[in-house]
Amino acid sequence: MSIKNLPADYLLAAQQGDIDKVKTCLALGVDINTCDRQGKTAITLASLYQQYACVQALIDAGADINKQDHTCLNPFLISCLNDDLTLLRIILPAKPDLNCVTRFGGVGLTPACEKGHLSIVKELLAHTEINVNQTNHVGWTPLLEAIVLNDGGIKQQAIVQLLLEHGASPHLTDKYGKTPLELARERGFEEIAQLLIAAGA
């Protein structure tokens, strides 16, 4: 292992989950938060490749868990986007910045609601104070995304119910002024419509 190639060796070791090599690189003085050409740090690569023990080792060594790559990814957002509950449970005790947003301007809860990642939504709402009414670049809240960008099925109904129970507003409209109730009814999602009505929509 040459000093010249130390950053590349370190990043590859993290991606492959080679904790001993990661620790050797750190002992040789590599910057723990060095990035590849896409802006991905070692802990981001370990997160993407589900190298959970390596993620924990890097947290313990003081890695920056909030640093985002060129497409705004970081370990917390990766866990939310990829439905990776194991990763989320490693990251949350390290106190990630819950206000970090995806390239579309949504907090981690937003894509989890859109994609139907029920276990992630439950974990976030039970164990964090993440903003349930945060509005992304296209004017949608997590509630609106849960309605508009999925199939209205059982999982989405459960997500809508959880959001409403945790303070999501049934009155916040999209950028065209349409309410969650209107959008649910337009799509024929009557079960979701009834949940919204019960919440005061």
UniProtKB/Swiss-Prot annotation:
Protein's GO biological process: response to radiation
Keyword Repeat attributed: yes
SMART domains linked: ANK (SM00248)
Record-linked SUPFAM superfamilies: Ankyrin repeat (SSF48403)
Disulphides: none
Keywords carried by this UniProt record: ANK repeat, Repeat
Superkingdom assignment: Bacteria
InterPro entries, alphabetized: Ankyrin_rpt, Ankyrin_rpt-contain_sf
Positions annotated as ANK repeat: 5-34, 38-67, 71-100, 104-134, 138-172, 176-201
Keyword Repeat applies: yes
Coiled coil regions, renumbered to chain: none
Name listed for the protein in its UniProt record: Putative ankyrin repeat protein YahD
Organism: Escherichia coli (strain K12)
Gene responsible for this protein: yahD
